[in-house]
Amino acid sequence: MPRYEIVDTGEVKETDLSEIEEIPPDLNIRAVDEALGTEEVGVKIWYFEPGEEIGYHAHAEQEELYYVLDGEFSLKIGTSGDEEYVEVGPGTFWVAGPETGHGHRYVGDDRGAVLAIGAPFVEDPGLDPHSLDED
């Protein structure tokens, strides 16, 4: 029998990460993956106020896909020394594979939101893209 879950975004608790010392950045999120009980993929909705950002970083194993739900963002994406800067808005997707630097700053006027999906769903803390060796 297939295993499935259904959840409405409004049913997923919004968490203020500034209240959790071990987890930067100080943004608000909805941990959709926790509400659904996913095991293979991480799913979060990140909320941004003007000027807030997720700094430029990379992951050793995880590929991350993003989708802009609301607002305008300035992306920094690509290999260290060869980054691109791109302005994106609602309806835009972008993806960063393992060891690919990526970060984004909210440049909109109202609250912004991004859906972030990462796989594999492993403990994969952010790496400094400038310290990664190129093959």
Question: Over which residues does each language-model region extend?
Answer:
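Short histidine-centered beta-strand/loop micro-motifs
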Residues: 33-35, 54-60, 77, 85-86, ...
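A short, N-terminal "cap"/entry segment at the start of jelly-roll beta-barrel domains
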Residues: 1-40, 55, 126-135
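Double-stranded beta-helix
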Residues: 3, 103-135
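Histidine-centered metal-chelating micro-motifs
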Residues: 53-55, 74, 92-94, 98-104
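Short acidic-glycine-tyrosine-enriched beta hairpin
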Residues: 79-99
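Conserved short histidine dyad/triad with adjacent acidic residue
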Residues: 28-31, 44-60, 98
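Short, conserved beta-strand element in jelly-roll/cupin
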Residues: 47-49, 60-79, 117-120
